[in-house]
């Protein structure tokens, strides 16, 4: 069968499989490609091709991730699957693979296990907005009551972490049966049902250009007779010439008007998400704007110093610390384009944090940064990355 060409007309959604080790995440990923390949919506990838995921480096952290793509009648999907638990933790915290929704795989034979809980918590902390459940290996459970009990347990666990446990679609099946070509309701039918649930339940994400304008400032210079120019890559939204923007972070928020947008030395009417631009700012002196601040749509983002974070601490092998750190640890936190010193408060009962750990913590910065939930950052000591984190909650 001829391969369909990549359809740009379909909405694109990023998903991934999460769940406890050996509950069948990779088998399910392979099964999805096999079943959809029959309709020309995927290229079949065997378990081994997915499991031998190449290692990538994201901000100096080694993560093994398999990237698979497939399409349903409605959408095009990019799907990530990680071989090991540590890879999931790193992936979700660094945002290396942003997920618009996740497929939580739970073995019906075992029920929810420690990593099931941990992945749900991580999904909540790092801002994975939707979860669909695949209850796997149901052919190994003869007792229907037991099956209902496992489903109830999964729903309660999701609710415990503020996901709508009662509304979340749970599809029952056997990924292995589907992979072996079984056409029955636990095999192929279950995969189609799962994809229908993913299509319907996980909304198409908002495009970057539809979000409020934000541009991290990378450089500032003055052009004689014209004023101050801030350069950087537009992270989201659109800025039009003549629009008011706020300069947020590091000092008191200032308002200004963008009187010109330049790209590749040409003047434009607007700058869009993904563009590297120079924005000419009215009435601001060169020293009033600096790297580390952001230009943003007025009122869309505010400066903060205190926040809760979910953090992964690099191992020695990844070039991280060789020793643990303790309460009151004061490294630099690298947000977007600059480092800010901050102090760490560990959760009660946690004495120290070892390289390779992931941990929730509270941080207080010495100067405010334009901040919102889900913002990623690096933890550095003298320019060397020793950790990666994500803002789970802004405190003040």
Curated annotation (Swiss-Prot):
Region named G4: 136-139
Keyword flag Metal-binding: yes
Keyword Metal-binding listed: yes
Pfam family, one: GTP_EFTU_D2
Key words, A-Z: Cytoplasm, Elongation factor, GTP-binding, Hydrolase, Magnesium, Metal-binding, Nucleotide-binding, Protein biosynthesis
Record-linked InterPro entries: EF-Tu_GTP-bd, EF-Tu_GTPase, EFTu-like_2, EFTU_2, G_TR_CS, P-loop_NTPase, Small_GTP-bd, T_Tr_GTP-bd_dom
Residues annotated to bind GTP: 19-26, 81-85, 136-139
Reaction catalyzed: GTP + H2O = GDP + phosphate + H(+)
One Gene Ontology cellular component annotation held by this UniProt entry: cytosol
Region listing for G5, in residue ranges: 174-176
Region annotated G1, chain positions: 19-26
E.C. code: 3.6.5.3
Any one GO molecular-function label of the UniProt entry: GTP binding
Entry's localization field: Cytoplasm
Residues where Mg(2+) binds: 26
Domain (tr-type G) ranges: 10-206
Cysteine disulfide links: none
PROSITE patterns: G_TR_1, G_TR_2
Subunit composition and interactions: Monomer.
Protein family membership: Belongs to the TRAFAC class translation factor GTPase superfamily. Classic translation factor GTPase family. EF-Tu/EF-1A subfamily.
Listed name of the protein: Elongation factor Tu
Organism this protein belongs to: Anaeromyxobacter dehalogenans (strain 2CP-C)
